[in-house]
């Protein structure tokens, strides 16, 4: 991992210098150099420092993001938001001062005209309703008069029928009496002839 990516200053080079290799005497008068522990640990310490700076130290990344945000907001945009807000303020002021009063006046004039038309239409409808009500009342009165006349005619008819029925019943009773008398006389005459 050594040499890959940026290392934070003071971190990767913070390894302590280690002593140079020591020479050891071995049997047989051969001198052999044994590498010192510090020389083996230096690359490991350097790699650990780089890993630490990449995983745990986020200051360089955050500082870069902050610089980018400030640059984007202040330098690139400039006074664009301020100009937009000033244009909105100007538009609102013009609307409040010029357009809104004109709209109110136009609406007031048109609404008065519409109100007058509605009142005229309402009066006309009211008159039509009164005429319709009068026609219905006259028609209902005619129907009531016709109903009363029909009831009177029916009562007269029923009375006439009753009197005619009584007359017919009386005639029938008289005819029955005549027939009884006639048959009784015929029986008497027949009884005279039977005795012979």
Swiss-Prot record:
GO biological process: anterograde synaptic vesicle transport; endosome to melanosome transport; melanosome transport; otolith morphogenesis; positive regulation of pigment cell differentiation; vesicle-mediated transport
Superkingdom of the source species: Eukaryota
GO cellular component: axon cytoplasm; BLOC-1 complex; microvesicle; transport vesicle
InterPro entries membership: Bloc1s5
Pfam families, alphabetized: Muted
Disulfide cross-links: none
Coiled coil start-end: 103-196
Keyword field: Coiled coil
KW Coiled coil (keyword) present: yes
Protein family membership: Belongs to the BLOC1S5 family.
Functional note: Component of the BLOC-1 complex, a complex that is required for normal biogenesis of lysosome-related organelles (LRO), such as platelet dense granules and melanosomes. Plays a role in intracellular vesicle trafficking.
Subunit description: Component of the biogenesis of lysosome-related organelles complex 1 (BLOC-1).
Protein name: Biogenesis of lysosome-related organelles complex 1 subunit 5
Organism: Gallus gallus
Gene (name only): BLOC1S5
